[in-house]
Structure formats: C-alpha cells, structure tokens
C-alpha cells in the first residue's frame, strides 16, 4: 500500500493507493513503464476483496522469473458506494454516475505526476497504460481516449458499455489522435448485452481511425463476469499491450528468442535443432509464471507436453549465462 488516504482534489475525498514494484526495482537503476488499474481492492490481496483477487503481483513476479520485463502497477481503490459515480462520466438516472471526468482528471493531473516524481518511471505516453474491468473497463476506455496524450495502452475487460449510450457519442466524436493499443476482453457467458457492446465498440474504434493492429477484441468461451476470469486473462493482455517493452531485451539479460516447432503443439516439441550437450536446464512456464515442466541436462530430442492443459506457454532453455525463450500454444 502506497497511501491509505491519498487526497483526490478533483473529488475532495481520500483514497487508498496501491503500488507494485518489479522484483528488480530495488537492485537496479532502471526506469519502468506504469500500468494504472482501478478497483485496487481486488488486484493484489484476497483479504481486501470480497469477490476474489486478480493476483497481479503473483502473475507479474512469475513473468519476471521467466526473464520477461514487468512494469510498475498503480492500483486505485474504488469508492464503495461512489464506485459507479466515479467510473461513469455521464449520469444514468437509475444507477448514478457523472463523476468519471473528475476521476480521470485525478489520474492524469494528480496521481500520475506524483508517481512519476517519486518512482523511477518511464513517464512518456508510450510507456503508460490503463486497465480495468466492468465499470473499470468503461472508465479505462474513456480515460485512454480522452487523454491520448497520456495513455497509449488500454486494457478493457468486460466493459459495461450498456450503462450509457453517451459512450457511443463520446467515442465517435473523439477521433484517433495517437497510436494506441486497445485490448477488449469479454467472457462468452456474460450475456448478449455485454458481448455485443464489445463488438460494437470494436467497430466504433475502427471507424474513428484505429487499425486492426491496434485493436484486440477477444470473446473467451465460458468466461464469466468474475475476478477469477479477469485474473486468468491478465497476463495475456499485459503481454500484448506492453509488447514493445516485453520484447525489448537488453544484453544484460542475455535472453534470445527461439522459434518452437511445431507450433501450435500437440504432444511433443521438437528439440533436435538445439545443441542439447550445452544445455543446462529446460523449463516451461504457463502465462501466470508457474513452472509446469523443468528438466536439468535434458538428453532427449523431443519434449513431451501432452499432459499440459490447452493454452499459451513459454519455453526457456538456459545455457551458462544465456537464456533462450520462445512462446508456444498447446492444443
């Protein structure tokens, strides 16, 4: 917890602010991108969430253990009874709203300058993202488009676009001003109103100038409107949104990309093109950073992965001080 009572002058109230620092923050002089996230109670600690946590810290620590760069994450608690009021820029006669503009202004003009002053950040828009779910997804979309000079990445999970038609008027009027990466996510079990809203927004974003390489809209079969669903999708969204940073591997990390064959993978990965005599360890991680296969001094020219669940994985081969990393899809 960074501050239990951080003052929000735009709203004249105080709020708990959380901060996640990368594992190497204290031992390096590096500067880091920043991801701002809403509903801070649900991001890091199950004891502060009544609905389950995203496990953002565990997930990023796991990615870091694979040699993947991770950002600073700033979590802003929601305001309880004020949550919808603060996350909705327009008034809904049934649910409230109307303070989203002030909340977004707080993020941009009060909180971000404080974070940039007190921590080793990369403050440029290219290195700043925003992410949230449900109403937090809605305000992420709003803030990212309104402040394209501040944010270049938006993670929009299960957005509640249905709550106000004003979101469509806003989006069509704002226009693309800067290159962006916008990642929308929806569970297949969230209902037609949510799902169709996401696809309509995809079309609306394309209509104001965003290219297909700037947009991801994913409908995950069986996904529900829950923290556990968003938790399981967080790593994949982060890796795409921060793709340039994730893959900007300095020589001090001595990490090199490898191509994996076949990919997607059925039962076995072909290792025959690698010099196994020089290999110290072989390890496979899931997207939450959990090691699911580890072998020291492997000798077989194929790796059995048939017991892995379908999904995305990372294979890391270590030779002395070097690491070779490749991503694969298990069918």
Regions found by a protein language model. Give the residues of each.
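Non-catalytic cap/lid and distal C-terminal segments of serine-dependent acyl enzymes
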Residues: 1-247
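C-terminal outer-membrane/trafficking sorting elements
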Residues: 254-331
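Hydrophobic, well-ordered secondary-structure scaffolds
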Residues: 138-142, 180, 251-253, 265-272
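Disulfide-bonded cysteine-rich modules in secreted/extracellular proteins
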Residues: 248-249, 260
């Amino acid at each position: 917890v960074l501050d239990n009572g951080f003052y929000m002058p735009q709203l004249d109230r105080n709020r708990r602010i959380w901060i996640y620092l990368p594992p190497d923050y204290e031992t390096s002089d590096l500067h880091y991108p920043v991801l701002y996230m809403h509903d801070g109670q649900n991001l890091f600690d199950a004891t502060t969430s009544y609905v389950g946590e995203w496990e953002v810290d565990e997930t990023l620590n796991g990615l870091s253990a694979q040699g993947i760069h991770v950002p600073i994450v700033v979590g802003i608690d929601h305001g309880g009874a004020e949550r919808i009021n603060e996350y909705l820029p327009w008034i809904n006669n049934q649910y409230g709203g109307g303070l989203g503009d002030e909340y977004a202004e707080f993020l941009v003009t009060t909180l971000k300058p404080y974070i940039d002053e007190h921590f080793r950040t990369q403050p440029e828009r290219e290195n700043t993202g925003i992410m949230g779910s449900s109403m937090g997804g809605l305000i992420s979309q709003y803030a990212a488009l309104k402040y394209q000079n501040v944010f270049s990445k938006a993670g929009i999970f299960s957005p509640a676009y249905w709550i106000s038609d004003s979101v469509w008027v806003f989006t069509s009027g704002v226009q693309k001003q800067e290159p962006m990466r916008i990642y929308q996510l929806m569970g297949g079990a969230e209902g037609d109103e949510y799902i169709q809203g996401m696809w309509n927004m995809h079309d609306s974003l394309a209509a104001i100038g965003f290219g297909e390489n700037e947009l991801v809209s994913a409908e995950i079969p069986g996904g529900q409107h829950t923290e556990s669903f968003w938790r399981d999708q967080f790593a994949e969204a982060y890796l795409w949104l921060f793709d340039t940073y994730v893959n900007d591997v300095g020589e001090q990390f001595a990490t090199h990309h490898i191509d994996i064959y076949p990919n997607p993978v059925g039962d076995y990965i072909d290792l025959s093109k690698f010099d196994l005599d020089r290999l110290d360890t072989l390890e496979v991680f899931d997207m939450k950073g959990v090691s699911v296969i580890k072998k020291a001094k492997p000798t077989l020219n194929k790796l059995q992965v048939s017991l892995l669940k379908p999904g995305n994985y990372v294979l890391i081969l270590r030779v002395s001080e070097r690491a070779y990393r490749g991503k694969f899809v298990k069918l």
